[in-house]
């Protein structure tokens, strides 16, 4: 109960600070030429489903279905809710399109202007998941959470920065770097290789079965 109260306090602070930003947009008459995007990276479990925090499978709705509010002064639409499937990778493409900047060919996100203007359907399935854990797909009605066939099979980190993310953060150790290979198959690196580094799964990833939910 104490931690829930602390989290509620954090949300209240975020709400107040967001309100201050919106008040400034009112004060300086900025709505007519300012795009506003409010988004976050993940939700947070507060004991729902018997779980806590975020980075472990399954990615329930409380973690995966994140808020996204967009004001586009070019359309002026407000108070509209859309069921179009969008992802955070769409935001950079949306910003580039807004400023009439060419979207790089290797960028896999889809600009959201069509969604904002007339609820355009831009994808049939949205993908999300956790490194070394479940790979999930949803069409908005169902979500399929595919677990690895072999939880003990080797996994690799693909990067140009030899840093470990999540769990024990910091530089990847010398012994791990001895096993690196160059990997050329990433579509978003402009034909440049990245390091393929053997790594370990995080204990928090768990070993859950493949699941299917009707949302």
Describe the function of each predicted region.
Residues 24-80, 84-87, 106-108, 123-124:
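Histidine-centered active-site microenvironments of extracellular/periplasmic hydrolases
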Residues 1-34, 98:
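A long, amphipathic alpha-helix that forms part
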Residues 60-61, 131-215:
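C-terminal, low-complexity/hydrophilic appendages and adjacent surface loops
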Residues 16, 72-75, 100-102, 140-142, ...:
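Short loop segments at secondary-structure junctions
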Residues 32-34, 79-139:
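Polar, surface-exposed loop/tail segments
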Residues 1-6, 71-77, 215:
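Short glycine/proline-rich turn/loop motifs
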């Amino acid at each position: 109960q104490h931690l829930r109260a602390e989290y509620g306090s954090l949300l209240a602070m975020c709400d107040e600070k967001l309100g201050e930003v919106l008040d400034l947009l009112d004060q300086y008459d900025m709505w007519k030429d300012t795009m506003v995007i409010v988004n976050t990276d993940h939700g947070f479990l507060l004991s729902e489903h018997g779980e806590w925090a975020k980075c472990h499978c399954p990615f329930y709705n409380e973690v995966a279905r994140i808020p996204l509010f967009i004001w586009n002064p070019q359309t002026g639409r407000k108070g509209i809710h859309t069921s179009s499937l969008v992802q955070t990778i769409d935001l950079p493409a949306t910003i580039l399109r807004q400023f009439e900047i060419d979207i790089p060919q290797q960028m896999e996100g889809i600009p959201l202007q069509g969604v904002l203007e007339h609820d355009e359907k831009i994808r049939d399935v949205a993908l999300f998941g956790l490194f070394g854990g479940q790979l999930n797909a949803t069409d908005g009605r169902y979500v399929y959470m595919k677990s690895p066939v072999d939880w003990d099979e080797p996994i690799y980190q693909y990067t140009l920065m030899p840093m470990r993310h999540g769990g024990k953060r910091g530089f990847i150790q010398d012994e791990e770097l001895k096993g690196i290979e160059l990997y050329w198959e990433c579509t978003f690196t402009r034909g440049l290789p990245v390091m393929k580094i053997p790594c370990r799964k995080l204990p928090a990833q768990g070993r859950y079965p493949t699941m299917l939910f009707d949302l």
